[in-house]
Regions:
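Active-site neighborhood of phospho(di)ester-bond hydrolases with catalytic His/Asp-centered motifs
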Residues: 58, 89-98, 118-121, 169-171, ...
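Accessory terminal helices/loops
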Residues: 2-30, 122, 206, 213-226, ...
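Active-site environment of divalent metal-dependent phosphoester hydrolases
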Residues: 40, 63-65, 98-103, 124-127, ...
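Active-site HxH/HxHxD metal-binding segment of metal-dependent hydrolases
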Residues: 62-162, 251-252
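Conserved beta-strand hairpin/beta-sheet module of binuclear metal-dependent hydrolase folds
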Residues: 28-89, 178-188
Length: 317
């Protein structure tokens, strides 16, 4: 169970961030189940209190086939099946950030269960940014009202009897949040597995220096904290993995072990410069910035996605 954050690292461009000085709770390990989505390399999580059997879902996936334009709930239904099979009660549906590589199933799960949805409060900054890029009408809200709760940095909540808090972790996006629940931290697109480095920071609102500073905050969590990443791309064809430790990240992640802040910023910026845009980014963000809701149906009863043409430079090669 996390007890303290020793130091708070200020992030560039923001006032100093703070997190709870201490957490108290059951002292038991969080019961974490990861379900891997091979199509996007994403991991969706169920984290449960082993005593009360109450749980949260983190980063649920709504399946989308780009060729046919069809959505399916296969991955999200796996979450519901697991929750039912293990006698769990869903208490939270949590997004760590608006994803660029898959659709969020938060809206679907809320409809199916009634559990509240949540994300970091700075999602409103990302909504404003992308409203301009999509040229959306003023009727589209950019106040975060698509979620039931917007977490501030350091804000506490509970999952069953387990104490939890939200840790603002920008860099990949403006509003990325790490959820620390019991002794588990869900670090999304900051740290990947130690053999895979770190997440990109070149999306609109992304910043490599902020990503470095966010990672340093995560690494200052108690040494017993288990780290759960948001993606795994199976380098060299190995089996998918998603759990690591602070010690293994410090010792084996080359983006941390071999870098100080200026070196990391250069490495990350150089790598990002030649990365292709995620296949689903322009489709996914207009859904994910609406809390995992498809656009409102038009007069024929069908929803349509809007793609801004020539809004981003093409990466050649």
């Amino acid at each position: 169970m996390p007890k303290a954050i020793a130091t708070v690292v200020p992030l560039a461009g923001h006032a100093q961030l703070r997190a709870p000085a201490a957490l108290t709770g059951t002292g038991l390990d969080a019961d974490v189940t990861g379900l891997y989505d091979g199509a996007s390399g994403s991991v969706q999580y169920i984290v449960a209190d082993p005593i009360t059997r109450r749980c949260a879902v983190i980063d649920p996936v709504l399946n989308y086939d780009q060729r046919s334009g069809s959505t399916q709930t296969t991955s999200a239904d796996q979450l519901l099946k697991h929750i039912k099979a293990h006698g769990l009660t869903l208490e939270w549906i949590l997004d760590t950030h608006p994803h660029a590589d898959h659709f969020s199933a938060a809206g679907y799960l809320r409809d199916m269960t009634g559990a509240p949805t949540a994300i970091g409060e700075r999602v409103t900054d990302v909504q404003k940014l992308w409203k301009t890029l999509y040229n959306l009408p003023d009727t589209v809200p950019i106040d975060g009202s698509q979620w039931d709760r917007l977490f501030a940095d350091g804000e506490r909540f509970t999952v069953g009897q387990m104490q939890a808090f939200a840790l603002l972790s920008p860099g990949h996006t403006l509003c990325s949040i790490t959820y620390v629940i019991g002794n588990a931290a869900f670090v999304h697109d900051t740290l990947f597995m130690p053999d895979s480095g770190t997440a990109r920071a070149d999306f609109p609102g992304g910043n490599a220096r902020q990503l470095w500073q966010s990672i340093q905050r995560i690494l200052q969590l108690p040494a017993t904290t288990r780290l759960f990443t948001g993606h795994d791309y199976r380098p060299n064809g190995r089996e998918a993995r998603w759990e690591s430790t602070i010690a293994s990240q410090r010792a084996h992640n080359p983006h941390l072990r071999d870098c100080d802040e200026p070196e990391f910023v250069k490495l990350r910026t150089d790598r990002d410069r030649n990365l292709p845009m995620p296949n689903l980014m322009l489709s996914a963000l207009q859904v994910n910035l609406a809390g995992g809701r498809l656009p409102a149906p038009e007069d024929d009863g069908r929803s349509y996605l809007k793609i801004p043409l020539n809004a981003f430079p093409q990466v050649v090669g």
